[in-house]
Amino acid sequence: IDYFYYDYDKLREENIDPIVFFFGGQYPILDYQVHCSIDKDLCTQYRTMNGAPDFKQGADKDAVVLDVREKNIDKTMPDYAYNPLAQTPYTMLFINADVVLEYIPKSMKTKGLQANPDAKVIQEDAWTLWDVTTSKWTFYKMFNKVIDEAKKISDPTERANYVYNFAMLNTLVHNNPYFSYRNFGSVFAFLLDKLKVPYSRLLVTNRMTEPIGQLANIWNVTDGFMLSNGQCYFPLSTRYVTTANTIPSIYQNRDAVATDAKKKFQKGPFRNVTVPGSQAKDNTEKVDIDATIDGILLNIKRQDATTGCDKEGNIMDYTSAEQMAQAWGADYGVTKFAQLYDKGLNVADQRAAERAEQDKKSIADNFSDEIKGYHDRAAVKVNDTKVLSCGEKDKPFTYLVDYQMDGLVKKAGRNLVVSVGQLVGQQVHIEGAERQRNVDIIYPYPRTYSVTVRLTIPDGYTVSPESLQKLNSNVDLSLIHISEPTRLLSI
């Protein structure tokens, strides 16, 4: 049983964070009850999602009263490949006052209760917010040079990509979005206008929030842009954005609202669109392993190459700022990381040296964690790690790790047993009741995963072909497509 109590004095300076009630959990729920008593002088909005039961509405003196009760909730939330915001009934509750220190949209200025308000009204608030934050922008010397170079490019999409990828370069090397999330709509529109690139404005929500057609809160909206060829641009992110030509996975196939209007765009006209998605061939991870048995140890050299959305969140973890600056900066005349500091030469060189020391430790730690994550156990020894390709433009992000593992080779009499399954990637552990599933499996995007293992065995040993069949027999081919079953290539 959870109790929440908020003092009205808090609402004079800031609003209460949104409250979410999920009608489901990790285990079946016998009895779930929600009771709310909210001052009538506040604006109370709620939205029920995915078939969540509605509140019974009432009043008590100066308060709005909301009650809901559900018994015997048998539906549970699996841990694997499940999106609660798309698959579990839940209700979002927003309580707002007209506080001075925050921007309060028009729809939230009406006192009292608004049950499941029209999403278009909240969309109008989001367009208005975009409009009031629109302004002219100035940039530092190097960025202005990039803009001037972009103007020389004949293709409008490539002009936009050139500027966006430079901003992405700065985002990666500084580990911080070059344009803030809230300013992106204003600053990138300013840049596209400056570059004379035609565009549509988009309002969209990501897959971790409600659909735009059921919008409940303007702060869940993302400002974006779509060109006539379907190319889209969204706020820079250290977690999801890779390059201009790859739409972040959290926005793919999401419904959006668009307008082509340039002046007074907040008034429309609007149209419904869908952000383009990707295919499995666009998002690939290719793993090549050379493994050698050394007694009961396994010496492994593993190369991992990713494309598309599979690059998300990986580049910064394993690549030094210096290497990223040189690879991503080649098109912009950047030859070293220090050039990306808007400081004097001495200060820039000093900061670059400090960053190099930080990278040396953090990258080593990240690679150690990567090896542990891949095999579900730590390496005995890490011999070498290196990034071969930094993933700039549409190139793969590729790295090589050389290490030694124990526990993957065991002696059984005169035989050696190799845990080949732990060479093909991290194992998914699905236990107990979750092994029987009656809800959809939701992956963030389609992908292709391929592993090639070359195992060098000691002299005098041969491989039993029958043992490889176990890698196929444990897979239900009606659920997962295997383009090429495991086979013995050579001994």
Give the residues covered by each predicted segment.
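Conserved structured core elements
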Residues: 28, 137-140, 154-161, 178-186, ...
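Hydrophobic/aromatic-rich core segments of domains that either
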Residues: 166, 183-269
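Short, well-structured beta-strand/strand-turn elements
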Residues: 171-175, 193-209, 445, 461-467
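Hydrophobic, well-ordered secondary-structure elements that form the walls
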Residues: 192, 302, 455
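Short, Gly/Pro- and small/polar-rich lid/capping loops
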Residues: 267-279
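Leucine-rich, highly hydrophobic segment in Treponema pallidum outer-membrane-associated proteins
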Residues: 280-297
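A carboxyl-terminal module marker
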Residues: 318, 328-479, 483, 487
